[in-house]
From Swiss-Prot:
Keywords: Ribonucleoprotein, Ribosomal protein, RNA-binding, rRNA-binding. This is Large ribosomal subunit protein uL24. Belongs to the universal ribosomal protein uL24 family. The gene is rplX. GO terms for molecular function: rRNA binding; structural constituent of ribosome. One of its GO terms (biological process) is translation. PROSITE patterns: RIBOSOMAL_L24 (PS01108). The keyword ATP-binding does not apply. One of two assembly initiator proteins, it binds directly to the 5'-end of the 23S rRNA, where it nucleates assembly of the 50S subunit. One of the proteins that surrounds the polypeptide exit tunnel on the outside of the subunit. The keyword RNA-binding applies.
Length: 101
Protein backbone atom coordinates (compact mmCIF):
# COMPACT_ATOMS: atom_id res chain seq x y z
CA UNK A 1 0.00 0.00 0.00
CA UNK A 2 1.20 3.51 -0.72
CA UNK A 3 2.25 5.71 2.17
CA UNK A 4 3.15 9.37 2.22
CA UNK A 5 6.07 8.83 4.59
CA UNK A 6 9.57 7.97 3.42
CA UNK A 7 12.62 6.50 5.12
CA UNK A 8 14.59 9.33 6.71
CA UNK A 9 11.57 11.55 7.49
CA UNK A 10 11.31 13.06 10.96
CA UNK A 11 8.03 12.06 12.60
CA UNK A 12 6.21 12.76 15.86
CA UNK A 13 4.57 9.89 17.74
CA UNK A 14 0.90 10.58 18.51
CA UNK A 15 -0.13 7.58 20.66
CA UNK A 16 1.38 5.04 23.02
CA UNK A 17 4.07 5.06 25.68
CA UNK A 18 6.36 7.32 23.61
CA UNK A 19 3.69 9.92 22.80
CA UNK A 20 5.21 13.30 21.96
CA UNK A 21 8.67 11.99 21.07
CA UNK A 22 10.18 12.69 17.68
CA UNK A 23 12.53 10.53 15.66
CA UNK A 24 13.68 9.45 12.24
CA UNK A 25 11.93 6.72 10.24
CA UNK A 26 14.35 3.78 9.90
CA UNK A 27 12.13 1.42 7.90
CA UNK A 28 8.59 1.09 6.58
CA UNK A 29 6.58 -2.14 6.33
CA UNK A 30 4.13 -1.28 3.56
CA UNK A 31 2.29 -4.60 3.75
CA UNK A 32 1.38 -4.31 7.46
CA UNK A 33 1.41 -0.47 7.55
CA UNK A 34 4.03 -0.22 10.30
CA UNK A 35 7.06 2.04 10.72
CA UNK A 36 10.15 1.73 12.88
CA UNK A 37 11.28 5.01 14.43
CA UNK A 38 14.86 5.42 15.66
CA UNK A 39 15.15 5.25 19.50
CA UNK A 40 11.37 5.06 20.04
CA UNK A 41 9.11 2.21 21.22
CA UNK A 42 12.10 0.31 22.60
CA UNK A 43 11.56 -3.30 23.76
CA UNK A 44 13.91 -5.81 25.32
CA UNK A 45 14.68 -8.96 23.34
CA UNK A 46 16.48 -12.07 24.58
CA UNK A 47 19.10 -13.32 22.13
CA UNK A 48 20.02 -16.95 22.69
CA UNK A 49 23.61 -18.14 22.56
CA UNK A 50 24.53 -19.81 19.27
CA UNK A 51 27.51 -21.70 20.64
CA UNK A 52 28.23 -23.10 24.12
CA UNK A 53 31.00 -20.51 24.59
CA UNK A 54 28.64 -17.56 23.99
CA UNK A 55 26.26 -16.24 26.61
CA UNK A 56 22.63 -15.33 26.09
CA UNK A 57 22.01 -11.61 26.31
CA UNK A 58 19.23 -9.07 26.44
CA UNK A 59 19.27 -6.29 23.84
CA UNK A 60 17.16 -3.17 23.34
CA UNK A 61 15.44 -3.01 19.98
CA UNK A 62 12.95 -0.69 18.26
CA UNK A 63 9.48 -2.21 17.82
CA UNK A 64 7.16 -1.27 14.94
CA UNK A 65 4.51 1.44 15.37
CA UNK A 66 1.31 1.62 13.35
CA UNK A 67 1.64 4.21 10.61
CA UNK A 68 -1.56 5.96 11.74
CA UNK A 69 0.12 6.78 15.08
CA UNK A 70 2.90 8.92 13.58
CA UNK A 71 2.81 12.27 11.78
CA UNK A 72 5.46 14.09 9.76
CA UNK A 73 7.32 16.65 11.91
CA UNK A 74 9.12 19.60 10.38
CA UNK A 75 10.15 23.04 11.70
CA UNK A 76 8.38 22.46 15.03
CA UNK A 77 5.03 21.52 13.47
CA UNK A 78 3.43 18.08 13.12
CA UNK A 79 1.21 18.00 10.05
CA UNK A 80 -0.44 15.79 7.49
CA UNK A 81 1.18 15.48 4.08
CA UNK A 82 -0.27 16.58 0.77
CA UNK A 83 0.94 16.44 -2.82
CA UNK A 84 1.09 19.23 -5.41
CA UNK A 85 2.61 19.55 -8.86
CA UNK A 86 5.25 22.21 -9.50
CA UNK A 87 6.98 22.36 -12.90
CA UNK A 88 5.62 18.90 -13.79
CA UNK A 89 7.12 17.39 -10.61
CA UNK A 90 5.14 15.86 -7.78
CA UNK A 91 6.15 17.51 -4.48
CA UNK A 92 5.18 16.70 -0.88
CA UNK A 93 4.10 19.56 1.39
CA UNK A 94 2.82 20.09 4.93
CA UNK A 95 -0.89 20.83 4.97
CA UNK A 96 -0.72 23.06 8.07
CA UNK A 97 1.66 25.67 6.71
CA UNK A 98 2.17 24.78 3.03
CA UNK A 99 5.93 24.22 3.43
CA UNK A 100 7.58 21.87 0.92
CA UNK A 101 9.19 18.75 2.38
Amino acid sequence: MKTKLKVGDNVKILCGKDRGKTGEVVSIDRKNLKVIVKSCNMVKKVVKARTPQEKSKIIDKEAPIDISNVMLFSSGIASRIGFKFENNEKKRYLKKNGENV
